From Swiss-Prot:
Keywords: Chloroplast, DNA-directed RNA polymerase, Nucleotidyltransferase, Plastid, Transcription, Transferase. DNA-dependent RNA polymerase catalyzes the transcription of DNA into RNA using the four ribonucleoside triphosphates as substrates. GO terms for biological process: DNA-templated transcription. The keyword Transcription applies. This is DNA-directed RNA polymerase subunit alpha. InterPro entries: DNA-dir_RNA_pol_insert, DNA-dir_RNA_pol_RpoA/D/Rpb3, DNA-dir_RpoA, RBP11-like, RNAP_asu_C, RNApol_insert_sf. Residues 1-231 are annotated as: Alpha N-terminal domain (alpha-NTD). It is an enzyme of class 2 (transferase). GO terms for cellular component: chloroplast; DNA-directed RNA polymerase complex; mitochondrion. In plastids the minimal PEP RNA polymerase catalytic core is composed of four subunits: alpha, beta, beta', and beta''. When a (nuclear-encoded) sigma factor is associated with the core the holoenzyme is formed, which can initiate transcription. It catalyses: RNA(n) + a ribonucleoside 5'-triphosphate = RNA(n+1) + diphosphate. SMART domains: RPOLD (SM00662). It comes from Amborella trichopoda.
Amino acid sequence: MVRKEVPVSNRTLQWKCVESKADSKRLYYGRFVLSPLMKGQADTIGTAMRRSLLGEIEGTCITCAKSERVPHEYSTIVGIEESVHEILMNLKEIIVRSDLYGTRDAFICVRGPKYVTAQDIISPPSVKIVDTTQHIASITEPINFCIGLEIERNRGYRTRTTNQDASYPIDAVSMPVRNANYSIQCYGNENEKQEILFLEIWTNGSLTPKEALYEASRNLIDLFIPFLHAEERDLHLDDDQNIFTAPFFPFHEGLAYIGIGESKKRIALKRIFIDQLELSPRTYNCLKRSNIHTLLDLLSKSQEDLRKIQHFRVEDVKRVLDILKKRFAMNLFT
């Protein structure tokens, strides 16, 4: 455990990690302080950070298991104590760390009698098992136990789909932050009250609380970047006076208006993230798994490239093209 004194400054806004500990391989704790803040600012920041920590942080987990020997999910295998369903639930609990998007293949192939743990998972170098002692199955007889696994990086909770080709999808929970809380302490006199924000973060070990804080902060910054380049010309209301219509402008014209030259347009494109394009969750996840994170990444692909993305439908391609045309006056090569 690491403890530090909390400095209270009346001048420069500062943050510190005042407590950091690992209760186990699957439970990390961090306590952070931000001060000095004006009255009301601590609650604003605390609320936004907590929502970002719990809902926006991406994680990696096992999403599917494959075995041709298994007739259905609720069957049992001779020589193994656990049912297939129990094995799937154990795989769901395995904590995995990976910074890469897309599907990664892994497998388990052992011979009993054996106590199978996460250590027996053979995975690519880009995937790390956080706790190799996590239990998967108990083999009581001299039989072979071989299953294939799919590992994906995503965020939030995703329900499984119907199994195909001897595959058994797992309800994926890509939420590395287990909990996040904040508290506020006020100080100073009535005329000049200031606040200290205390932020507590618990993670599952796939990333540290400090890493989670960094990622949550970056996600919030990405959400607010469009407001820094807001187009304010010719704003108008329709006849209804209740419906606000933002003016349309070609993307390159908008870049010129905010003072961005040709040489810097790539930087501007890189600062527009695909989560700002109002895509459906399904389309967004497919693009993210293909390492398409920004508008620049998207424009580097052709329509044919999008059609080749796993689970990406023709209507998804049409939706992306429609957004690019209406919002940016752009298109993709066929």
